[in-house]
């Protein structure tokens, strides 16, 4: 536009001299034509720019409308209840089986010196399906996630191992969990059996937590954990449950058991890592029964009611050269348990003439194991278990009402077991294990030679393993 005005101004300024000196009208007309051409040229360019501006504004308006429609659609979708097709949890299956050769009858297995839980044992002879699992896990919404683990037993029964929800949005390192879950006490208990380094649980887990040969101690209740915001790993946990499982029995209202624990851990250089902890479990069993025999060999049912307190110390040390565990690594693991029980022991409690008496016991047990991966995929392990029946005070015996032989399972004994294993893992989804145990836990003094061949296959997604 400035050039147009300049041209017009120039024409006005020089128009008179041009007219004055023009030789004829054709020269004047030529100048006018040039001015007209300049005007038309600039007008066309202005029109083109105005058209481009309108097109750009139209496209911007269209984009804004599309964004608004997309936002509306997203809000509608989020407000709509999730359909069955939208439910997409992580699903995994654990296939496990064993072949066992046992020199003693597994049906007569008892650990001497301790009130027996209902499911103590060594497994089954011959081929067995083992403890296969079906697991579902998913985030429920931005605030919770859920997990369901169903165990398929060798006797074709189905058991809900875990069914819990856990918070995702709590701040300051806090997480809360509710439902049925493996307790966080000790070290081994939170780890599923297919991730253990040996086929079966330590003897201390059987007599103090009632896990059986391949189980975990679980509860129906609530759990609260806190991870400290420090370079050193520090975890504090508290739990309250119904106490249905040994050492409780759930025969009461309200809270039947509660637990507290503290775990700390960290790195030592670039090749070592450790974790240690202390845990406390308290239960209030009421009429907790167990089957036994009296001095004459007659079957009887005894029951205990009172208070059961368990203290656990655990420690794990891992070594991998410069943090690389692919070729070689070593893991040292151990736990110590000390239990105090006080209350009333009813002799032959289901008869018409039960004989009650005060009861107290101070007992302990431990295990220590080491597992060495000496080359990729191959591992070798050793474990030692030992229990001490400690001090057991049976009122009926102390007061001369009944002879000690009426409580044969509670006579002093030191159960122990030595285990060696070799396993091979073609991949992270499969493992084959050969295990031998020399078991001296029976009070009869008859030792058991236990050979186990085990396979483990993992199908589908699975989470990271515990430290």
Which positions does each model-derived feature cover?
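Conserved aromatic-histidine-acidic binding/catalytic patches
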Residues: 34, 212, 250, 303
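Outer membrane beta-barrel
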Residues: 80-246, 252-270, 280, 317, ...
């Amino acid at each position: 536009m400035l050039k147009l005005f300049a041209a017009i101004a120039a024409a006005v300024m020089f128009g008179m001299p041009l007219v004055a000196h023009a030789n004829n009208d054709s020269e004047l007309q030529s100048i006018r034509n040039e001015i007209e051409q300049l005007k038309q040229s600039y007008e066309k360019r202005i029109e083109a720019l105005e058209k481009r501006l309108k097109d750009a504004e139209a496209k911007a308006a269209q984009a804004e409308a599309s964004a608004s429609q997309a936002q509306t659609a997203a809000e509608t979708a989020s407000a709509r209840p999730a359909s069955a097709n939208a439910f997409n949890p992580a699903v995994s299956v654990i296939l496990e089986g064993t072949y066992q050769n046992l020199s003693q009858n597994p049906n007569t297995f008892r650990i001497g010196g301790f009130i027996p839980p209902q499911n103590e044992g060594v497994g089954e002879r011959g081929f067995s399906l083992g403890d296969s699992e079906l697991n579902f896990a998913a985030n429920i919404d931005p605030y919770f996630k859920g997990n369901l683990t169903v165990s398929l037993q060798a006797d074709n029964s189905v058991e809900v191992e875990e069914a819990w929800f856990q918070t995702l949005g709590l701040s300051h390192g806090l997480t809360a969990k509710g439902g049925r879950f493996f307790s966080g006490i000790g070290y081994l208990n939170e780890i599923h059996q297919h991730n253990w380094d040996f086929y079966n649980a330590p003897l201390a887990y059987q007599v103090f937590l009632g896990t059986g040969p391949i189980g975990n101690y679980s509860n129906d209740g609530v759990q609260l954990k806190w991870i400290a915001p420090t370079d050193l790993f520090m975890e504090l946990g508290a739990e309250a449950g119904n106490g249905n499982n040994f050492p409780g029995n759930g025969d009461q209202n309200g809270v039947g058991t509660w637990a507290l624990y503290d775990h700390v851990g960290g790195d030592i250089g670039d090749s070592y890592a450790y974790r240690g902890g202390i845990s406390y479990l308290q239960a209030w069993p009421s009429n907790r029964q167990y089957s036994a025999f009296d001095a004459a060999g007659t079957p009887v049912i005894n029951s205990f009611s009172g208070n059961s307190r368990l203290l656990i110390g655990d420690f794990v040390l891992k070594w991998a050269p410069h943090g690389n565990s692919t070729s070689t690594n070593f893991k040292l693991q151990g736990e110590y348990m000390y239990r105090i029980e006080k209350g009333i022991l009813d002799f032959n409690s289901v008869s018409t003439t039960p004989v009650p008496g005060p009861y107290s016991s101070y007992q302990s047990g431990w295990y220590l194991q080491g597992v060495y991966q000496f080359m990729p995929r191959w591992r070798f392990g050793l474990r030692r278990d030992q229990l001490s029946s400690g001090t057991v005070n049976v009122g009926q015996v102390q007061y001369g009402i009944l002879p000690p032989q009426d409580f044969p399972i509670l006579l002093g004994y030191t159960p122990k077991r030595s285990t060696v294993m070799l396993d091979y893992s073609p991949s992270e989804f499969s493992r084959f294990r050969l295990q031998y145990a020399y078991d001296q836990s029976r009070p009869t003094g008859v030792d058991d030679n236990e050979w186990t061949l085990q396979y483990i296959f993992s199908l589908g997604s699975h989470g990271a393993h515990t430290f």
